[in-house]
Regions:
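Active-site metal-binding motif and surrounding structural segment of the metallo-beta-lactamase
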Residues: 31-84, 285-304, 313-320
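Long, well-ordered mid-to-C-terminal structural blocks that present hydrophobic/aromatic surfaces
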Residues: 240-305
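Pre-active-site segment of Zn-dependent metallo-hydrolases
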Residues: 19-50, 64-73, 184-190, 196-206, ...
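Conserved beta-strand hairpin/beta-sheet module of binuclear metal-dependent hydrolase folds
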Residues: 1-46, 248-274
């Protein structure tokens, strides 16, 4: 779990398989990820899969820097990459737009010229202009000739098309998004375009693909649902304050169950609790166990992406919470209390990649159920997960 500031970046590694899930900001790659990938490459290892869970600057900045630095897939300046999962507009629609009228072209050009958000590179010495005018993720994947969504990027990664990807020592199972959630993202894009004055049919080409990605990088900054609504002194429960997240980009997150070398991980990206709950209940009805070896909590520990109902179905001895608290005050203390205050025959460990007011507060919390837990802050070194330590 990398120190990705308010973002996400995870590298999962076994003797046979390496998976990078999101990349935080470009500074996350420059300062941390790049070194680890070069060490893997020196051992003749590759990235078997790179998952970009959804379009958000705090998840994709480091991946953009990786692909820009790595060059063509045949050149691989840093490391060989076998497959990249990323749902761009190219992956979501088959309607090709070959030409645009001048007034619609102006709308697309304006979105592209705005570039990436200013905070896209959080490294103070990084040139802001180059960060904002840099290539989009979709452009870099396509130009680099990478295997994209198992083929050429024209297929989406969703529960309706891709359920499982196999590796030598395990698999990745897709839990979200559904095709319906991806359709909602397209609808949100269409609504944005109409608001900007775009009048023609909404299709896809390289410029429109770029505009799609850049638009959602910016739109994700606009709304932070519910933060700072609950006073720290209220001590309200998650049941009292939980409301479902309604972000179309978060709803498009690629959430997965990853099984490698006998270890089961639940990686929830920024996914919606209701979508995850539906899938895990379906799997549970088929006889699958919903006890994992580790769970990456959704959306940096937000109260609005992990419901009490979901917590009643899933559990693990290890929880990963990725946030420095710099935006939206994540993680939320109500969620942290709800995680640890459940009866269990084992001790839970909460791993935070930073020390935040909430991580310090939860240290002193006394679970009413008598459940025991440990808090590990600044947990950015390798975390070894072994089956013997699990339940």
């Amino acid at each position: 779990m990398y120190p990705a500031q308010n973002g996400d970046a995870f590298l999962l590694s076994t003797n046979k398989t390496n998976i990078l899930i999101d990349g935080g900001y470009s500074s996350t790659f420059n300062s941390y990820i790049q070194k680890d990938l070069k060490e893997l490459a020196a051992r003749n290892a590759c990235l078997n899969l790179v998952i970009i869970t959804h379009i958000d600057a705090d998840h994709i900045g480091g991946i953009i820097r990786l692909l820009a630095s790595n060059g063509d897939s045949n050149v691989k300046n840093i490391i060989s990459i076998e497959d990249v999962w990323h749902n761009s507009l190219r992956s979501l629609t088959s309607v090709n737009q070959t030409a645009l009228p001048p007034e619609d072209l102006e709308v697309i050009d304006a979105i592209i010229k705005r570039g990436h958000p200013k905070e896209f590179s959080s490294l103070p010495s990084f040139n802001e202009i180059s960060a904002r005018q840099g290539s989009t993720l979709a452009t870099l994947i396509k130009a680099g000739g990478y295997v994209w969504n198992r083929t050429d990027g024209t297929q989406s990664i969703c529960t309706d098309s891709v359920q499982v990807k196999q590796f030598q020592d395990g698999l990745v199972r897709v839990l979200t998004p559904s095709r319906a959630r991806l359709n909602s993202l397209i609808k949100s894009w269409q609504q944005d375009l109409r608001r900007y004055g775009f009048t023609g049919p909404v299709g896809t080409n390289q410029a429109i693909d770029d505009a799609f990605e850049l638009n959602f990088e910016h739109s994700n900054k606009v709304k932070a649902k519910g933060e700072i609504l609950i006073s720290a002194g209220c001590n309200k429960s998650l049941e009292e304050i939980y409301k479902p997240d309604d972000s179309p980009t978060n709803a498009s997150s690629i959430a997965t169950i990853i099984e490698l070398d006998g270890i089961r991980l639940l990686m929830l990206a920024d996914a919606l609790a209701e979508d995850i709950l539906m899938e895990v209940q379906r799997l549970k009805s088929q006889g699958e166990v919903m006890m994992f070896d580790a769970i990456k909590i959704s959306h940096h520990g937000s109260n609005y992406n992990t419901s009490p109902e979901l917590l009643s179905v899933i559990d693990a001895p290890r929880y990963f919470i990725s946030s420095d608290g710099s935006k939206h005050n994540h993680p939320d203390i109500e969620l942290l209390r709800a995680i640890v205050d459940r009866e269990a025959s084992f001790t839970r460990t909460l791993y935070f990649n930073y020390s935040t007011p909430e991580s310090r507060e939860i240290r002193d919390f006394q679970a009413t159920t008598g459940a025991t837990f440990i808090v590990e802050e600044n947990a950015t070194s390798w975390i070894e997960i072994t089956k013997e330590q699990s339940c």
